[in-house]
Amino acid sequence: MFSCKQHLSLGACVFCLGLLASTPFIWCFVFANLLSLEIFSPWQTHVYRLGFPTACLMAVLWTLVPAKHAVRAVTPAIMLNIASALIFFSLRVYSTSTWVSAPCLFLANLPLLCLWPRLAIEIVYICPAIHQRFFELGLLLACTIFALSVVSRALEVSAVFMSPFFIFLALGSGSLAGARRNQIYTSGLERRRSIFCARGDHSVASLKETLHKCPWDLLAISALTVLVVCVMIVLHVHAEVFFGLSRYLPLFLCGAMASGGLYLGHSSIIACVMATLCTLSSVVVYFLHETLGPLGKTVLFISIFVYYFSGVAALSAAMRYKLKKFVNGPLVHLRVVYMCCFVFTFCEYLLVTFIKS
């Protein structure tokens, strides 16, 4: 049994790791909303808006780096992250022309920020389920704070409102070591120690073993993703569902997707129910979008994604349970979830940019 102090300490650490894991999405969101203006800076706008799918893809690529090399990158990464954010802060305050320097700064810092979701998730999803919820809460809260800053135009008024970004980096990077030292985490890691012929210190699931253990979960997630992508295309063309949402939807997709959803009961039943609700909501929007009005149409369209997130959360939780004996089970979860984020954010970019409703 673990003490209450250990649980509280780990809960605080993983909450801060949630704040840290949000930083690549927040970085993209801030640039896409403050510096994107298609009339005056067309190529910069495309760079910033493509940042969301790029961040998802880079987070997946970081999972291919061995753990010991990823840990060694922490100190240089955090120093460069803070330096880049300070330079951006200075440019916003003191410079009137950022049409070249800002995109270069954005592209230089983004790959390093994408290291944090890998390091955070690798720790969090070895811990008990209650601590995983603290992580997801931290990630969702961080995304919500910056979304509200943009909605209220606070970021446009003053660069001071970038300060939470520095706080997230400082708290999160400082919590990495604390979470690793916690006895609850180390005991979870111990349960994944390899026995007999497995390579390395801990059991690692190969691609073949992952496909063998979770074929139907992966197939169901793929089917749900294809369904919602088709819904996005049809509703964009016929109902103009992205009108007024294009500024906020990528952050919502990344934040809510990575944070999971509500999942109770059997994963396959939840997935079927959520797929049915997605289909029904899309049919209502398709046929009644003029009757519903802008608000009703937007609420129903967003609810389609909420249902999808809940279905995928149930399926990914089932996958994590099947891979609980393997130390790289959390990384499999990250690859699946962030590839779904990549598909949605890239699809949203293509629809809004090239396919006019």
Swiss-Prot record:
Q: Per the record's keyword annotation, is ATP-binding included, yes or no?
A: no
CC per GO annotation = host cell plasma membrane; membrane; virion membrane
Q: Which residues lie on this side of the membrane: Intravirion?
A: 33-46, 92-98, 155-158, 239-240, 289-298, 357
Q: Which UniProt keywords apply?
A: Glycoprotein, Host cell membrane, Host membrane, Host-virus interaction, Membrane, Transmembrane, Viral attachment to host cell, Virion, Virus entry into host cell
Entry membrane topology? Multi-pass membrane protein
Compartment list: Virion membrane; Host cell membrane
Q: Which GO terms describe its biological process?
A: symbiont entry into host cell; virion attachment to host cell
Does the keyword field hold Transmembrane?
yes
UniProt PTM: Extensively glycosylated by O-linked oligosaccharides.
Mark the transmembrane ranges: 12-32, 47-67, 71-91, 99-121, 134-154, 159-179, 218-238, 241-261, 268-288, 299-319, 336-356
What InterPro entries does the database record attribute to this sequence? Herpes_BMRF2 (IPR006727)
Q: Topology: which residues are Virion surface? A: 1-11, 68-70, 122-133, 180-217, 262-267, 320-335
**Sequence motif Integrin binding site, residues:** 199-201
Task: Give the highest taxon in the source lineage.
Answer: Viruses
Q: Tell me the Pfam families matching this sequence.
A: Herpes_BMRF2
The UniProt subunit note reads as follows: Interacts with BDLF2. Interacts with host beta1 integrin family.
Q: What does this protein do?
A: Facilitates virus attachment to oral epithelial cells by binding to host beta1 integrin family. Participates in rearrangement of cellular actin to increase intercellular contacts by binding BDLF2 and thereby promote virus cell-to-cell spreading.
* Sequence similarity: Belongs to the herpesviridae BMRF2 family.
- Per the entry's comment, what about the domains? The RGD motif presumably is the main binding site to host beta1 integrins.
State the protein's name. Protein BMRF2
**Which lineage ranks, top first, belong to the organism behind this chain?**
Viruses, Duplodnaviria, Heunggongvirae, Peploviricota, Herviviricetes
